[in-house]
């Protein structure tokens, strides 16, 4: 009997993954990860659960109940230090440099598919590691692995896994690859799992829901600055340019608008002058670009294709792009059709139809060879 270790989060997806693997005849053990401590990490402002039981402890209790239901052993491991050093400091430093990072992707790279796998393989000696992600792995005749989209396109999580190296996908199982979320809930209900109706987790990976402005103030105190039109007209003050992203409409403090008048949208940022630029047009030309520089690229497979698709943010429909490799880990992408709100700091994931080829960090954005003032 082959042994598999499942990352058990307390949620329904990982619970059903463990259930399916046990029914398939595997020897199943589970591991719960604790990666955030509000007291140790000075997470006070913007924390709605500060005076309640820690949400991660509630998740652990759910994971423990599921493991007892399934008759599998549950281990608990603490990656609070690793998460702080490898994920959160990067996240904060990116904001400090006026970028818009995606901590969920870095969390997968450094914690779920690195620290967790290292712990599980060294301590528990399984043949496989399983995760409750909605993703698929495809093997060719030489057993080379590719990351691919799952059956449930609405829950597709390949964007969040896009920067994983090929070595991190070795001996990984995704039991939910051929199931929809509705089917997962149905399986959980039919088998009486205690978390069958539990809401999906939201917010920052392993941290949860926060008042984001207040949360960032724990680590990066806001610096008041000017909100201007592109022509330099002063409108009002903002609470810190790092708190806004390209294309943002809400929380600009520019008042209500009469019927037929568009609200203002963020079309540019300048960290050096601490200035936020806005225009009253959701389709303003300054929101669009036709070229971007991508750095820190992870690529799985050959680099022969130049005409592929890209996703610059989660749930964005795939966009046609042309690749131009500049070196082993840097490329530029061209998209003459123009794309809205391509934002520095975000991850650009690359696809060949349903195969996720890799990803990198958006560094700079251009339109007609002129750099956009987004940072």
UniProtKB/Swiss-Prot annotation:
The active site is at 107 (nucleophile), 205 (cysteine persulfide intermediate). It is found in: Cytoplasm. Signal peptide: none annotated. Keywords: ATP-binding, Cytoplasm, Disulfide bond, Nucleotide-binding, RNA-binding, Transferase, tRNA processing, tRNA-binding. The record marks 133, 346 as: Interaction with tRNA. It is an enzyme of class 2 (transferase). One of its GO terms (cellular component) is cytoplasm. It holds the Pfam family tRNA_Me_trans. Residues 102-104 are annotated as: Interaction with target base in tRNA. It catalyses: S-sulfanyl-L-cysteinyl-[protein] + uridine(34) in tRNA + AH2 + ATP = 2-thiouridine(34) in tRNA + L-cysteinyl-[protein] + A + AMP + diphosphate + H(+). Disulfide bonds join 107-205. ATP binds at residues 7-14, 33, 132. Residues 155-157, 313-314 are annotated as: Interaction with tRNA. GO terms for molecular function: ATP binding; tRNA binding; tRNA-uridine 2-sulfurtransferase activity. Belongs to the MnmA/TRMU family. Catalyzes the 2-thiolation of uridine at the wobble position (U34) of tRNA, leading to the formation of s(2)U34. This is tRNA-specific 2-thiouridylase MnmA. It comes from Phytoplasma australiense. The gene is mnmA.
């Amino acid at each position: 009997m082959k042994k598999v270790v499942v990352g058990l989060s307390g949620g329904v997806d990982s619970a059903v993954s463990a259930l399916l693997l046990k029914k398939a005849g595997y020897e199943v053990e589970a591991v719960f990860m604790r990666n955030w401590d509000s007291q140790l990490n000075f997470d006070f402002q913007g924390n709605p659960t500060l005076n309640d039981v820690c949400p991660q402890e509630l998740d652990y209790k759910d994971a423990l109940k599921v493991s007892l239901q399934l008759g599998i052993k549950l281990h608990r491991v603490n990656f609070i230090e690793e998460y702080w050093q490898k994920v959160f400091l990067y996240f904060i430093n990116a904001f400090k440099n006026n970028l818009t990072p995606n901590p969920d992707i870095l969390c997968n790279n450094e914690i779920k598919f690195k620290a967790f796998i290292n712990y599980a393989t060294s301590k528990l000696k399984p043949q496989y590691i399983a995760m409750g992600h909605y993703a698929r792995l495809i093997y060719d005749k030489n057993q080379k692995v590719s990351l691919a989209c799952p059956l449930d396109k609405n829950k597709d999580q390949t964007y969040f896994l896009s920067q994983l190296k090929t070595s991190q996908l070795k001996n990984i199982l995704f039991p939910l690859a051929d199931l929809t979320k509705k089917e997962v809930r149905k399986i959980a209900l039919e088998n009486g799992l205690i978390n069958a109706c539990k809401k999906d987790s939201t917010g920052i990976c392993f941290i949860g829901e926060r008042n984001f402005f207040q949360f960032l103030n724990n680590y990066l105190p806001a610096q008041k600055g000017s909100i201007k039109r592109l022509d330099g007209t002063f409108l009002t003050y903002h609470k810190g340019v790092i708190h806004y992203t390209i294309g943002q409409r809400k929380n600009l403090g520019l008042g209500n608008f009469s019927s037929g008048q568009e609200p203002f949208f963020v079309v540019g940022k300048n960290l050096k002058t601490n200035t936020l630029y806005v225009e009253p047009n959701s389709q303003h030309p300054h929101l669009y670009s036709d070229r971007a520089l991508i750095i820190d690229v992870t690529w799985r497979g050959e680099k022969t294709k130049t005409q592929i698709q890209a996703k610059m943010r989660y749930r964005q429909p795939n966009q046609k792009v042309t690749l131009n490799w500049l070196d082993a880990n840097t490329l530029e992408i061209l998209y003459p059709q123009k794309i809205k709100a391509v934002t520095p700091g975000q991850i650009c994931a690359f696809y060949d139809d349903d195969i996720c080829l890799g990803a990198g960090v958006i560094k700079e954005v251009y339109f007609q060879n002129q750099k956009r003032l987004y940072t």
